[in-house]
């Protein structure tokens, strides 16, 4: 028993709520299954008969499904609880994948491809983002920044690192179709760990005599009832514009200065490796220096500066691989400066944390549309330099907006006391930690 308590103490000290550790492990395994198709599914479908436009439309439909699912995940958790919401996400992924792989791809029937892949797209936000909402409810405020940092570490590690790494070996060994089927093993294993091994009890703040439809509508109305939450959603949308926009035009721009596709891919991959490490670091920094200050200076200002540096460095010094690698890594680190936003937003709406997290998750989805849209609209008339300045200006604007995301001391004290009481009732681990 002492060994178990010791492990719980260690996990809490590094920022992982010990009573939710199996949920974190479940998320990373689930996201491996979701991310294993990155980089090769579109070329595979084109090789089997789709046009490039049809493939682009397929992924656009998928993105729409992801955005809607992400937006609603928080209010679903607040209304029905995280286990039910995550179970719906797991089933959507499994059913959508089965239809997509087992029937739509063999027949290459385009409407079926659109519908089944969109159903699959509903899955991971309902699963992963609902767990993030769960974390925001069940974690003490003094480690909440680190706790959400660990969530984004697990999420990104599975989606952008382990998933593609696994498929780089699985596709040559088993083929594309069997690799897609293997995703179900990962999501099932992750689902079992997060839903059944994770013993935390969820206790949402209940509203008396409020119909469920009104609770669900909070995902939209909270942005007007609490403008700070709406501002936070805008900041979150700006967060990843570089992540979704750079890949469209930077490789072509860098090629003018002698950077090969291979060098670009190495720089891009290393950027995200640094990012997942700094997700944890800036989670801890946010708990020490303040969530708002971390997002504003390290996230907004940092991303703005290194966005400009990525563009101007090749012009100033030409082909210098390691210099550009260092700058890209600095951008990846600054990108993680936005991590405390996941702790800040639910604290701005202590009575509607689920709705606040829905707005945060909506921002996560919207940037996947807005960034390519900016590139497509302005790359022609303004060129790469114009797009870079638009991105940098948006990052600096997000830093300005973050100034308004203030929390009153009174709300913070009430929230901390509520968290303290709930955790002592819920888990033996936290009871030990608090003693």
Curated annotation (Swiss-Prot):
CDD domains: MFS_CsbX (cd17337)
Residues on Cytoplasmic side: 1-13, 78-85, 134-142, 198-228, 286-293, 342-354, 398-435
Database matches in Pfam families: MFS_1
Membrane topology: Multi-pass membrane protein
Taxonomic source organism: Bacillus subtilis (strain 168)
Name the record gives this protein: Alpha-ketoglutarate permease
Keywords: Cell membrane, Membrane, Transmembrane, Transmembrane helix, Transport
Annotated InterPro entries: MFS, MFS_dom, MFS_trans_sf, Polyol_permease-like
Bridged cysteine pairs (disulfide): none
Main location class: membrane
Gene this protein is translated from: csbX
GO terms for cellular component: plasma membrane
Compartments, record wording: Cell membrane
Extracellular-facing ranges: 35-56, 107-112, 164-176, 250-264, 315-320, 376
